[in-house]
Amino acid sequence: MAAGTKEDPWELKTPPGTSSYTMYTDEQADPPALVCQVGSTTLKYRLRAIKDLHAWLKEQGDWVPLGAADEKKPAADGTVEAWGRSANNPVGGWYGLRSGYRGRFGMYLPPLLEELGLAEVSHDARNNRMRAI
């Protein structure tokens, strides 16, 4: 498995398997970040999202829909995407750090948790779900 550094990032695929992207940690950022490179687009999420999302999934105790959506689109209730921007999550709002690119939490975080052995993700063409391991 990759080290998750800029030099040795995690190489991941979206849950449907249609797109590839990389992620790595930037612990020197303020706040510490996960850097997600999708083609020429860079997205950033709070590093603590890994532990926080895993804890929330464990609380749910079952499969949770991913519900990936862009920042400007509403997220369906009860989805990973909705939790990643909810005022009721541990950071009180968005885990995404780059304005205009804060969405897609439900697309890019689940495969990382699966890679790290923290979650199981379905890999269907649409309507994917995840659960904690």
Show the residue positions of the predicted features.
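Short, hydrophobic-biased segments on the C-terminal half of alpha helices
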Residues: M107-P111
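A short, conserved structural fragment
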Residues: E114-N128
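Charged, low-complexity intrinsically disordered segments and flexible loops
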Residues: D30-A33, G93-W94, R131-I133
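Solvent-exposed, non-transmembrane amphipathic alpha-helical segments
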Residues: D70-K73, D77, R129, I133
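Intrinsically disordered, low-complexity segments enriched in small/polar residues
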Residues: S19-T22, L43, G93, S99, ...
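Long, low-complexity, charged/polar intrinsically disordered regions in eukaryotic proteins
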Residues: A2-A75
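Short helix-coil junctions and helix-kink-helix linkers
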Residues: D77-T79, G84-R104
